[in-house]
């Protein structure tokens, strides 16, 4: 069995977070893969952690202090997940990222192509048109990498959807 820790940090976007979790739960994973979800609540006041706990009782909710923001919230989720269980992969996911049904499988397939020795960055597109890439990897001075169906080298990335193999 291969394990993936999905890591999210949230702040006052209850409906957005629930939609993201719904799409994550619907993922068509390769056989033998399971996903555990670690969600850092960085001081939500809109009921997000309570709704998540009610609708997704298996999600590990980590309490933040309101000063973690995205970066340190993701680090906290990573540290707790790594101390809790051995994971083969870590999936960074923004709560406003709506996954296509096989998004995680595509990331895993691409990771396998490079023997799980590279960070795989996903691209996101405009939710209405699906034709405009909104976030992805970058090269040089803010040159956004446009998906072309092949693996492409990037120098830095936003982090909306990123697969990090344990080997990295």
Language-model features: where?
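A conserved acidic beta->alpha catalytic loop
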Residues: 40-50
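Short beta-strand-to-loop acidic/aromatic patch adjacent to the donor-nucleotide binding site
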Residues: 86-98
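Glycine-rich, basic loop-to-helix element that forms the pyrophosphate-binding segment
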Residues: 64-82
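Active-site acidic Asp-centered loop
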Residues: 42, 64, 93-95
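A conserved hydrophobic helix/loop-capping motif in glycosyltransferases and polysaccharide synthases
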Residues: 4-16, 20, 27, 40
